[in-house]
């Protein structure tokens, strides 16, 4: 259920874009992200920082897109969110307070060195996605960017998540690996 809620704004954005245009889709994205927060809080009685940051970015850049009738703002939102994620992960790792370890470390007991590898992998991933988004958003047609944002970035994120899980699994202690089989 939680994963469906995470994808709800993206699905609504894509569907509304296909039937209308980028401006109506941007307004729908703002509304869907707000709805996501309300439903998430109603079901789980808490909100993650990532959801709040995403909502703030969607609201700011979506509103700018609507007010100035310029799709560049909603396109930049993707890169800025990825840059913030990369920055947060990188700074936390430099301070020896891995965000990924704090999120997953209770379930996956691996060495700090492995958490550092995973963190820098995701920093690189987010940075590269942000840069590729700039290229696709401003060098290719709007339709291509929307498809890239919805399908390309989602697929890349899922693939990288699977790669990360396999990498972490490989470095789990033997007794914990047996528990997962």
From Swiss-Prot:
InterPro entries: YciB. It comes from the Bacteria. The chain crosses the membrane at residues 10-30, 50-70, 72-92, 118-138, 148-168. One of its GO terms (cellular component) is plasma membrane. Keywords: Cell inner membrane, Cell membrane, Membrane, Transmembrane, Transmembrane helix. Coiled coil: none annotated. It is a multi-pass membrane protein. Its main location: membrane. The keyword Transferase does not apply. It is found in: Cell inner membrane. Plays a role in cell envelope biogenesis, maintenance of cell envelope integrity and membrane homeostasis. NCBIfam families: ispZ, PRK00259.1-2, PRK00259.1-3. Belongs to the YciB family. This is Inner membrane-spanning protein YciB. It comes from Shewanella sp. (strain ANA-3).
């Amino acid at each position: 259920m939680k994963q469906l809620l995470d994808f709800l704004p993206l699905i609504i954005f894509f569907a509304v874009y296909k039937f209308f245009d980028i401006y109506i889709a941007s307004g729908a994205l703002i509304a869907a992200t707000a709805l996501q927060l309300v439903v998430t809080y109603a079901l789980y009685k808490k909100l993650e920082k990532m959801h709040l940051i995403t909502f703030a970015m969607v609201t700011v850049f979506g509103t700018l897109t609507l007010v100035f009738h310029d799709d560049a703002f909603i396109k930049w939102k993707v890169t800025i969110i990825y840059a913030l994620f990369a920055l947060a992960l990188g700074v936390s790792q430099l301070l020896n307070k891995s965000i990924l370890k704090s999120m997953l470390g209770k379930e996956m007991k691996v060495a700090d060195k492995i958490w550092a590898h995973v963190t820098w992998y995701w920093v690189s991933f987010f940075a590269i996605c942000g840069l590729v988004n700039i290229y696709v958003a401003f060098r290719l047609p709007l339709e291509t960017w929307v498809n890239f944002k919805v399908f390309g970035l989602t697929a890349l994120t899922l693939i990288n998540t699977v790669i990360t899980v396999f990498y972490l699994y490989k470095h789990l202690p033997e007794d914990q690996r047996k528990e997962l089989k």
